[in-house]
């Protein structure tokens, strides 16, 4: 069997490191062709030594010399730097699939290049579909490129519709853990810190997504992602708070039947399924024990979790509005982590940015680039005044 050559965009992050664990468990099937990182140069070099890829890319060019130096005794590994190098490397002939595990808007350009080069996409960068879902899905259809979801929720939805053909979907049930502040009052939420928000009850993730999970903006983004991936309007996507994170999501069909995917919270499972689909491969790890705990479901409180309501609002408005929300969110998320913005202030600044940024009903790629820059500037200015 020919080994599948995988390019991991963002190999030093939470998803990237777990993807390498999957590759390590199946060395007969998968090989890391290219590994990339933004700033974590030492980790990238260590991964390169272990997995011996054909190439590595460090997006931040300031780290290029350091990476070259760290890998000086491994001349077979080509070393590149810069955002353009990311877009070029995904087009490399030997690559079979690209795992987009970078965080934020920066994942959009390399994903588009990979689609145009007809590489199978294992999508973990949800911002790509939040910002430019229409464009990305159209390009994927034109190039006949499969997009396989890596988010645990979207993988669960995907697994629930496998074998269903054209059977109509009545509703998608998108589960959310509720994050660390699920039981907090609005008053209590005024004073929470980044350290409080980074203590996620069920998932171990990167810092940016952990804050998005605490504000429930992450779930709002996942609604947008589900809309594009599965062609289901947002009013047919119901968010359920499910603190145990065992039911990863479910699909209700036209006859009222509901199919769900359950499992322990382990991101390696959706990563591996995206790699191996339609096959299932063995995976070492914990197994689900349904006797351990009850499964609970609650309605989300949209007053407390304003960010989730704003995401739904952005879908309703359409056009470049989700792009505006994403850009503002990236700014306030980082601001909150650095103590420049309060937890509830994040939603307030995003809402004001939505009102101030230039709206476009029919955006193209250049519009998204301009919108992203404008919304970031507005959000940063609002944050400085707050």
Regions found by a protein language model. Give the residues of each.
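Catalytic, metal-anchored helix/loop core of enzyme active sites in primary metabolism
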Residues: 1-386
């Amino acid at each position: 069997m020919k080994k599948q050559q995988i390019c991991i965009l963002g190999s030093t992050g939470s998803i990237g490191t777990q993807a390498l664990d999957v590759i390590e468990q199946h060395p007969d099937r998968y090989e890391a062709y290219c590994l990339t990182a933004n700033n974590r140069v030492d980790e990238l070099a260590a991964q390169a030594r272990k997995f011996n890829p054909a190439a590595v890319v460090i997006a931040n060019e300031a780290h290029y010399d350091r990476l070259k130096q760290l890998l000086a005794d491994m001349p077979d590994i080509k070393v590149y730097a810069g955002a353009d190098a990311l877009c070029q490397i995904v087009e490399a002939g030997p690559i079979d699939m690209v795992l987009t595990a970078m965080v934020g808007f920066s994942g959009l350009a390399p994903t588009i290049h990979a689609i145009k080069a007809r590489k199978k996409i294992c999508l973990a960068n949800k911002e790509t579909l939040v910002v430019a879902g229409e464009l990305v899905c159209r390009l994927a259809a034109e190039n006949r490129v499969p997009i396989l979801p890596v988010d645990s929720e979207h993988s669960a939805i995907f697994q629930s519709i496998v074998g269903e053909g054209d059977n109509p979907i009545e509703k998608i049930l998108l589960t959310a853990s509720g994050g660390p502040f699920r039981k907090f009052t609005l008053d209590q939420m005024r004073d929470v810190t980044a350290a409080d928000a980074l203590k996620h009850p069920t998932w171990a993730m990167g810092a940016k997504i952990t804050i998005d999970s605490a504000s429930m903006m992450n779930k709002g983004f996942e609604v947008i992602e589900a809309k594009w991936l599965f062609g289901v309007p947002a009013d047919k996507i119901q968010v359920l708070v499910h603190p145990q994170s065992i039911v990863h999501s479910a699909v209700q069909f036209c006859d009222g039947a509901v199919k769900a995917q359950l499992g322990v919270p382990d991101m390696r499972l959706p990563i591996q399924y995206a790699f191996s689909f339609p096959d299932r491969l063995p995976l070492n790890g914990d197994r689900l024990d349904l006797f351990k705990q009850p499964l609970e479901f609650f309605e989300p409180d949209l007053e407390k979790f304003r960010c989730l309501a704003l995401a739904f609002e952005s879908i309703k408005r359409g056009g470049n509005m989700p792009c505006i929300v994403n850009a503002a969110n990236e700014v306030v998320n980082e601001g909150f982590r650095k103590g420049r913005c309060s937890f509830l202030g994040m939603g307030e600044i995003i809402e004001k940015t939505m009102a101030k940024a230039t709206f476009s009903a029919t955006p193209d790629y250049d519009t998204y680039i301009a919108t992203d820059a404008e919304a970031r500037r507005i959000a940063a200015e609002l944050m400085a005044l707050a």
